[in-house]
Design a protein with these regions (language model features):
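Hydrophobic targeting/anchoring helices
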Residues: 51-54, 216-217, 229-232, 236-317
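Active-site-adjacent "subsite" loops/lids of carbohydrate-active enzymes
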Residues: 94, 98-160, 190-208, 220
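Aromatic-lined carbohydrate-recognition surfaces of secreted/lumenal glycan-active proteins
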Residues: 91-103, 166-170, 205-248, 265, ...
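Aromatic-lined carbohydrate-binding/catalytic grooves of carbohydrate-active enzymes
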Residues: 41-76, 100-118, 122-123, 174-186, ...
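The substrate-binding groove and active-site-proximal loops of carbohydrate-active enzymes
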Residues: 15-31, 59-76, 131-151, 200-218, ...
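Catalytic domains of carbohydrate-active enzymes, especially glycoside hydrolases
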Residues: 31-56, 159-160, 310-317
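Glycine-rich, aromatic-flanked loop segments that form ligand/cofactor-binding clefts
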Residues: 2-3, 10-13, 44-52, 76-130, ...
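An active-site-proximal structural segment forming one wall of the substrate-binding cleft
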Residues: 39, 43, 84, 137-172, ...
Length: 317
C-alpha cells in the first residue's frame, strides 16, 4: 500500500494542456517555468500533471526516441518542471500520449490507423470524431508502434522520478482496417475481419468484442512497460471514453491496468455528478480523478473561461 501513499488526500490537481507543434520557432521558446510553478503554488496545487510527450509526439525533454520539440532549443522542460514541483512539495503526474501521435503518424506511415475508406486520419478535413486533420492516429496493434511506446515509457521512467503517469487516449477513435488489425484478427479467430456493421450478425458482434479486448490488452501492455522500470509509479489510463460509443473499444477491463480511474469530461457539473458516482464504484483505489477545463464549454473554445460560479460548482460536486 505504500505506493499509493501520495494519492491519499491529494485532491487539488492541475494540467496545463500543451499539445503545441513546432512549425513556428517561437512556440514554447519563451516558456517560464518559475512563473508556471508560482501559479501552481498560488492555487494550492497538490499534484501537477506535466506534459512529457503530447499529441504532436514531440518530446518536451531531450529524447533518444522520436524527436524533441524544436522550440525548446534543447531545454529540458519536463525534467525541470519535475524538479521545481518537487522542490515546492508538489507531486508530479507525467503525461504521455498514446495512439494520437503526429510524429509517429508522419514518420512511420506503416503504423497508421486505416479507416474503412482506406485513409489515414489526417487525410480528412472538417469532419467529426477526430476527422479534422489535426490528429495523426496510429494503431495500438502495430508491433512497431508498440516498441516505440515501450521505448518512450522506459526512457521517461529511467531518466526521471515522478509519482504517477497519465497514459492518455486509450481507445480506438475509428474502426481500423490496417494490416496489423487484419492479421491479428485472423490470428485470434481464423477469420477475415468483418467490414459490414450488422448488429444481428454474430460475427460482427464477435469482432466488436474483440476490439474491446484489444484495447484492454494494450492498456495492460503500456502499464507493464512503466511498472517494469518503476513499480511504484501509479498509472491512470484515459477512461472517459467508457461513456462513448462502441467504436472506442473502452470497457471496464481497462480498470485492471490502472491504480485509479480518471478521465476528462466537458459536459458540465450535472454530468460530473454521475461520473463521480460511477468512478467511485469502479476505481481500484481512491481518490479517482475527474478532469475538466476552465474553457466554456470545452477545450475547443480555448479563449473562453467559465464563470467563477461554474468553477465553484465543479469544485463542490
Amino acid at each position: 500500500q505504500e505506493v499509493f501513499m501520495w494519492i491519499e488526500g491529494n485532491y487539488r490537481r492541475n494540467l496545463m494542456d500543451m499539445h503545441i507543434d513546432d512549425w513556428n520557432p517561437e512556440f514554447l521558446s519563451r516558456i517560464n517555468i518559475d512563473e508556471y510553478v508560482d501559479a501552481l503554488k498560488d492555487a494550492g496545487i497538490q499534484a501537477a500533471m506535466v506534459k512529457g510527450r503530447p499529441h504532436t509526439g514531440l518530446a518536451y525533454y531531450p529524447t533518444k526516441t522520436g524527436r524533441m520539440h524544436a522550440g525548446l532549443k534543447g531545454f529540458d522542460f519536463f525534467g525541470t518542471m519535475i524538479q521545481k514541483c518537487h522542490e515546492n512539495g508538489i507531486a508530479v503526474i507525467a503525461y504521455f500520449t498514446q495512439i494520437f501521435d503526429n510524429w509517429a503518424y508522419e514518420t512511420h506511415p506503416e503504423w497508421r490507423l486505416v479507416t474503412g475508406d482506406g485513409k489515414g486520419m489526417r487525410e480528412y478535413r472538417g469532419m467529426s470524431n477526430f476527422k479534422t486533420g489535426r490528429y495523426g492516429i496510429v494503431c495500438p496493434n502495430n508491433a512497431g508502434y508498440r516498441q516505440y511506446v515501450k521505448d518512450c515509457l522506459t526512457e521517461m521512467n529511467t531518466l526521471y522520478d515522478f509519482e504517477g503517469m497519465f497514459l492518455d487516449m486509450t481507445f480506438f477513435p475509428e474502426v481500423c482496417y490496417c494490416p496489423s488489425c487484419r492479421r491479428k484478427y485472423m490470428d485470434d479467430t481464423g477469420r477475415e475481419l468483418p467490414r459490414k456493421i450488422d448488429w444481428k450478425d454474430d460475427e460482427w458482434l464477435a469482432y466488436v468484442y474483440k476490439r474491446d479486448q484489444w484495447i484492454a490488452e494494450y492498456a495492460a501492455f503500456a502499464t507493464d512497460c512503466v511498472k517494469a522500470v518503476k513499480p511504484h509509479v501509479t498509472i491512470e489510463h484515459q477512461f472517459s471514453r467508457i461513456t462513448g460509443s462502441w467504436i472506442d473499444g473502452s470497457t471496464e477491463d481497462i480498470m485492471k491496468a490502472v491504480d485509479y480511474a480518471g478521465g476528462d469530461y466537458y459536459g458540465g457539473f450535472l454530468q460530473q455528478t454521475f461520473i463521480n458516482k460511477y468512478y467511485k464504484n469502479v476505481s481500484p483505489n481512491l481518490p479517482f480523478v475527474y478532469h475538466t477545463s476552465r474553457c466554456d464549454p470545452e477545450l475547443v473554445y480555448h479563449t473562453t473561461t467559465k464563470t467563477e460560479e461554474e468553477l465553484l460548482l465543479h469544485v463542490i460536486t
